[in-house]
Structures are given as C-alpha cells and as structure tokens.
C-alpha cells in the first residue's frame, strides 16, 4: 500500500513499483450507473469513453499523470526492483512481524526485458526465502485498447490536464453508495489476514 487508485489520491507510485513513465495516461473503469460517470459524460466527455468489452454498462475515465522529477520509472532494471522488494521484505515486513510463522508478502509484478531473464531467474532462486510469490511478465512497450497505463508525451499530458483541472467534484451527487468494500476486508479492524 498504497496501490491502485489509493496511490493516485496520495500522489505516489503504485505500491513498490516505479512510476510507469515520466508522462502517461492512467485509466479507471467505472460503472455507468455511478455519479462520477454522469457528471463527467455531461461536463467533460473528452475524459470518458465506453469500455471496449462492456460498453453497455462500463466506462473508462482517462487521467493524465506525471511522475515527480527524478522519480524511478519502469525503465529501471528488473534486478533493481527485485532488490527493493527484498529490502522492504527484510527491513519492513519481516522486521515488523510480531508472531506466527506467516508473514505478509510484498506484492510485486516484475517486468523482465529480454536480456534479463537468466540473471533474474538466478536472483529469484538465490533469494527465494525473501518472498512468498512474485508475478513475472515480459517487459513490453505493446499497448492494448484502454490499457490501465499508457505512455504519452508532454503535449498530450498538458492538453488532458486542462480538461481535468476544470472537473469540479463538488458537483457530483451520489444518491446511492455503490462502494464494494470486499477488497478491504483482509485488513479490517487493524489486523491483516
């Protein structure tokens, strides 16, 4: 933590991961029955589009993002991220663990460039006691329709930011609370499962 949309609120990268890029578009999916969708489609339709696979009930909101100056971006090596995962696991997670055999795991998706696979495999074997599991994907500049993160240039960022700055969240009235708290139950009541 913070991860997902929580990291957007706090202005941080998502979890242990680096920022996606210096400039990028972050996409969020919302139900067409949600108050924010109604507001944006009426007032800022340039920020909203139908979700490609579920256009009847889901929309995608696109928001420009800029990493802080000097921030680590996803161009870092897989070994650099793995070392950060190990350090946080040793110094923070296991260092703060109080009782029981099971400790939490640092959730991470490691994207591996073609020339990194052998050394990453070796590192993972040699350091297997420092993680419970890792997601591993090939690094790719390939994008798919409405990807959660997509690189953009400064001009695109600036153009989208103009629209975003005019969004007035005070004008959104939520008559029904459609919040699904199931994802937060694991750490409810001050104790994580």
Annotated model-derived regions:
Residues 178-193:
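Short acidic, low-complexity intrinsically disordered linear motifs used
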């Amino acid at each position: 933590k913070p991860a997902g949309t929580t990291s957007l609120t706090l202005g941080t990268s998502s979890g242990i991961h680096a920022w996606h890029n210096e400039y990028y578009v972050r996409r969020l999916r919302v139900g067409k029955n949600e108050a924010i969708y109604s507001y944006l489609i009426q007032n800022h339709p340039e920020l909203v589009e139908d979700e490609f696979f579920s256009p009847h009930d889901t929309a995608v909101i696109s928001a420009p993002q800029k990493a802080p100056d000097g921030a680590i971006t996803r161009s870092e090596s897989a070994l650099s991220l793995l070392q950060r995962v190990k350090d946080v696991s040793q110094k923070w997670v296991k260092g703060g663990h109080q009782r029981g055999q099971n400790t939490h795991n640092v959730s991470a998706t490691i994207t591996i460039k073609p020339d990194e696979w052998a050394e990453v495999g070796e590192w993972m074997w040699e350091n297997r006691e420092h993680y419970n599991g890792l997601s591993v994907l090939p690094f790719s500049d390939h994008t798919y329709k409405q990807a959660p993160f997509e690189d953009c240039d400064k001009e695109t960022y600036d153009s989208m930011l103009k629209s975003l700055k005019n969004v007035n969240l005070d004008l959104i009235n939520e008559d029904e609370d459609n919040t699904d708290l199931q994802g937060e139950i694991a750490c409810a009541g001050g104790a994580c499962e």
